[in-house]
């Protein structure tokens, strides 16, 4: 933290996270997304895959984490979260979570500070908070969210988006 009780993140950390987020990264995991059961009702699925930096290094704390949960409500979008993590911080994310949202209490001086932002959303770092500021996105297909995320995260070599295998017609 910048000050003992300031609540502000360390500016050096914010700068480092932004620098890594802006670098070109290479997908070094498998040639397809590997989903694992995350439990819940309806059942959710998660995927976590490593990335390499331009120098070839693969920091253990640099990865893409995805979460998918089919909607249990007809006409309500499925839940999808696509996140870039570095040093245990969510530095960039695209989230779709149906008819929900939050008020941006961080991001002073940014366009959506103090405003309610529904889903879908783009999460980025602010000077006053590493996570917690979101801007609205246009609704799109899950595949397009993935393509958009991979593009803005600067990730090359990522596999195409594939949903986890669901047991259609059976309760999950």
Question: Can you say where each PLM-predicted feature lies in the sequence?
Answer:
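An exposed acidic His-Trp-rich patch
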Residues: 80-136
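Charge-rich, low-complexity N-terminal segments
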Residues: 1-63
